[in-house]
């Protein structure tokens, strides 16, 4: 309260690290803690998550994302997804698509897997052709764009705090919508 105009935004945070204290802080801060969380998903398929050595399962992530959305109405919820990780099957990809459809994401960052020399992932069997990884990425990006469009439309006309960028009259709302400010 000593510096009333300071606002904070939580960057990328694992679903397993989000607790009730953080959600309460977002809920009760009057916009000082942005209603926005970026929860890396990587995949919506348990076999892929295990190969990635992720800490969460599909169901644990799903449960937490729904709890977050229920606890903080109008939260901007984002995620990262990697398509074409070694061993990812079409069924795994469709599990990811279904999870993205179900969860209240407002944006996604979708990347195709790219092998890096010297990494464990580069040595895994069953590489996915880059063409397939690219197609899967395009499908998820199209879904993400539609979800983002619907979320923006649902917020249209609502007043919102905007943090202006250094140059010009562009900024971000607390829930991570890019806006142009008139004036």
Give residue spans per PLM region.
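C-terminal, non-catalytic macromolecule-binding modules
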Residues: 71, 90-91, 95-137
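Terminal RNA-binding accessory module
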Residues: 112, 123-183
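Short, small-residue-rich loop/turn micro-motifs
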Residues: 40-45, 112-117, 175
């Amino acid at each position: 309260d000593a510096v009333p105009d300071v606002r904070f935004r939580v960057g990328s945070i694992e679903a397993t690290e989000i607790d009730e204290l953080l959600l309460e802080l977002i809920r009760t801060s009057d916009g000082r803690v942005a209603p926005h969380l970026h929860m890396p998903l990587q995949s919506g398929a348990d076999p892929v998550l295990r190969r990635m050595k992720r800490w969460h399962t599909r169901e644990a992530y799903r449960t937490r994302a729904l709890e977050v959305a229920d606890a903080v109405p109008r939260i901007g919820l984002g995620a990262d997804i990697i398509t074409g990780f070694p061993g990812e099957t079409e069924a795994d990809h469709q599990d990811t698509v279904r999870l993205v459809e179900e969860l209240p994401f407002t944006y996604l960052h979708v990347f195709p897997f790219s092998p890096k020399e010297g990494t464990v992932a580069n040595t895994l069997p069953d590489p996915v052709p880059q063409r397939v990884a690219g197609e899967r990425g395009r499908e998820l990006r199209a879904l993400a764009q539609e979800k983002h469009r619907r979320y923006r439309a649902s917020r249209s006309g609502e007043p919102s705090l905007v943090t202006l960028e250094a140059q010009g009259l562009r900024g971000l709302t607390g829930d991570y919508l890019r806006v142009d400010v008139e004036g």
